[in-house]
Amino acid sequence: MDIGMVVTLEEALLLKSMELNLEATIWSATPTDHRSLMPKPRYKTTNWKQYNKALINRGSLTFWIDEEAFAEWNQNKQGKRGRPRRFSDLAITTALMVKRVFSMPLRALQGFIDSVFKLANIPLVCPHYTCISRRAKEVEISFKTKTRGAIQHLAIDATGLKVYGEGEWKVKKHGTDGKRRVWRKLHIAVDTSTHEIIAAELSLSNVTDAEVFPNLLKQTHRKIIEISGDGAYDTRDCHDAIRVKRAVPLIPPREGAAFWEQGHPRNLAVGCQKLYGSNKKWKMRYGYHKRSISETAMYRVKQLLGGKLSLRNYNAQVGETYAMIKALNKLTGLGMPETQYIV
């Protein structure tokens, strides 16, 4: 078959092997009816008792304002000249996490945390709401977990967080001109095995996904086996960044994509697309479906912590977003459902 370019012998053998192996699979059904012949997969949660306990603990105040926060609430040393700040970065981070988890404006947040300290007979006070707003612009928030070792599959994607604008109902009924709707774009990299967010970055809405991709990979020094993303990441810069990490790229080439230089890992996906007319069989062969874990993570961010940013300053929005990511990783650490396929 003429696929537009002479590929290496190794690539040709791989393509032929894929062709022979996949012809005997479920794709033997006609393209118009194979989906209807496949029943919807069913899964059973095997650790429901532990997961149910984790869901209950999500609302525990002592989980969010813990002993570490009590001990390091006030800042003792600043590391530079001048009077030290009264509240530590951990205090500001904790306040921002509580704000997102319990969906509170800043003033209500201050009263809420003060009441917690009062009920617990702890001689601490919450930072003033203006202090939280100001410190959010420069607070150092580390959302990385203590998990170590190689990452088998890292899934990368992006979603939008609304700053302000018309509600969805008004847009549905009357439409919008888009002038008063402001968004920020959240880029995340998720470990598909643990559901932990390994890297994250907030950008303006006009920044493309591919522009942020290399910066996400620079945020972790752990070894990565596979890195997946959608077609928006099918660029030279993204593939070069993956090559630096010595990982396997799982990025579907765009429709009508051309081969790159001889021996490039992307050529196998391009050849498969030209051979079968689409990327479907390539996705099945190499487990591209794992990328959906990144979409699950974005859904969890919006469902559990809200899809709208309340702080108006961009730098403060970055701090608020990183507090959301840290909170989500804490929720993930409590426990996730373990499922088993039911035949």
Language-model region placement:
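Helix-centered, glycine/charged polyanion-binding patches within enzymatic domains
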Residues: 31, 36-41, 231-303
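Basic, amphipathic alpha-helical segments enriched in Lys/Arg and hydrophobic/aromatic residues
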Residues: 39, 89-93, 97-101, 279-343
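Short arginine-rich
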Residues: 120-123, 330
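Short polar catalytic/cofactor-binding loops
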Residues: 48-50, 159, 251
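Short, low-complexity, intrinsically disordered N-terminal modules
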Residues: 5-6, 11, 315, 325
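Polybasic low-complexity intrinsically disordered regions
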Residues: 77-93, 101-107, 111, 115, ...
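Charged, often Cys/His-bearing segments associated with DNA-binding zinc-finger transcription factors
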Residues: 2, 8, 12-81, 86, ...
